[in-house]
Amino acid sequence: MQEIFLCSISNVRSGDCKEDCAYCTQSSHHQGAIKRYKFKDEKVVLQEARALRQLGALGFCLVTSGRELDDEKCEYIAKLAKAINQEELGLHLIACCGRADLEQLEFLRDAGIHSYNHNLETSQNFFPKICSTHTWEERFITCENALRAGLGLCSGGIFGLNESWEDRIEMLRALASLSPHTTPINFFIKNPVLPIDAETLSADEALECVLLAKEFLPNARLMVAGGREVVFKDNDKKEAKLFEYGINAVVLGDYLTTKGKAPKKDIEKLLSYGLTMATSCH
């Protein structure tokens, strides 16, 4: 039976990001109807970690909005990491806090963070069409810094931004050069507050994207993330094919600003596909 790794997300700082990423409702350039707060209370984060671990999640990603890490964010994430690790839940802790230099990432590593998530999002060529406030090259350098710091690298992208198949290939080729241990695969879902006018990918095209990712990243943990619940809706037959085509990790529960599938029902569905849930991070 195929084993699936479950990962969960905690949006520990939400909204008011000064970047203009066209796909993101957390950008202050778009008037998204989202919750905005500076730092989530530590007790709430610990409750989330315990609850999701009890459901079977092994990965727990602490996400902050904004362009980059700064001293305040570093201290906050380090404090959360130490508190969660003291619980001895056996969680693999991931931080996702934007651009970061080597020293900052080494600080997080020493505080108990195991991996750093920083997505390339799309190809180098297409990126300027979806963001003007920072460059694709900055993203790539942060990924390199994570590896240099001795952290695991989690890096992937978004399909369905009106990019071409060549853009998809270029992104995956760049990801392959980084050898991430995990690659999140997101599917863009149209939102009226966002400037991207793109129709949701069909389930068949989404599956083709997964096959392509598997071809370029045969050894990475391919994690289906945002958009799965919309692209595949109630199409169990095609959703099950995700795992035949190379997906071996799933985001359990909610995303940053959108609802995911109800965790217990999602796990029941995954089990009905003949999958088993991983019990170890390795």
UniProtKB/Swiss-Prot annotation:
**Which GO terms are recorded in the biological process aspect for this UniProt protein?**
biotin biosynthetic process
Q: Which InterPro entries match?
A: Aldolase_TIM, BATS_dom, Biotin_synth/BioAB, Biotin_synthase, Elp3/MiaA/NifB-like_rSAM, rSAM
> Where does the Radical SAM core domain lie?
1-228
| Keywords per UniProt | 2Fe-2S, 4Fe-4S, Biotin biosynthesis, Iron, Iron-sulfur, Metal-binding, S-adenosyl-L-methionine, Transferase
Cofactor binding note from Swiss-Prot or TrEMBL: Binds 1 [4Fe-4S] cluster. The cluster is coordinated with 3 cysteines and an exchangeable S-adenosyl-L-methionine. Binds 1 [2Fe-2S] cluster. The cluster is coordinated with 3 cysteines and 1 arginine.
Q: Where does [2Fe-2S] cluster bind?
A: 61, 96, 154, 221
Matches recorded under SMART domains: BATS (SM00876), Elp3 (SM00729)
Q: Which Pfam families match?
A: BATS, Radical_SAM
Give the residues annotated as coiled coil: none
Q: Which residues bind [4Fe-4S] cluster?
A: 17, 21, 24
Q: What is its EC number?
A: 2.8.1.6
**Annotated metabolic or biological route of this protein:** Cofactor biosynthesis; biotin biosynthesis; biotin from 7,8-diaminononanoate: step 2/2
Which SUPFAM superfamilies does this UniProt record tie to the protein?
Answer: Radical SAM enzymes
According to the UniProt record, which cysteines are disulfide-bonded?
A: none
Q: Which cofactor does it need?
A: [4Fe-4S] cluster; [2Fe-2S] cluster
- Tell me if S-adenosyl-L-methionine is a UniProt keyword of this record: yes
An example Gene Ontology molecular-function term: 4 iron, 4 sulfur cluster binding
Q: Which reaction does it catalyse?
A: (4R,5S)-dethiobiotin + (sulfur carrier)-SH + 2 reduced [2Fe-2S]-[ferredoxin] + 2 S-adenosyl-L-methionine = (sulfur carrier)-H + biotin + 2 5'-deoxyadenosine + 2 L-methionine + 2 oxidized [2Fe-2S]-[ferredoxin]
Q: Magnesium as a keyword?
A: no
Whom does it interact with, and what assembly results?
Answer: Homodimer.
Q: What does this protein do?
A: Catalyzes the conversion of dethiobiotin (DTB) to biotin by the insertion of a sulfur atom into dethiobiotin via a radical-based mechanism.
Cite the PANTHER family for this sequence.
BIOTIN SYNTHASE (PTHR22976), BIOTIN SYNTHASE, MITOCHONDRIAL (PTHR22976:SF2)
What does the similarity note say? Answer: Belongs to the radical SAM superfamily. Biotin synthase family.
Q: What is this protein called?
A: Biotin synthase
| Gene coding for it | bioB
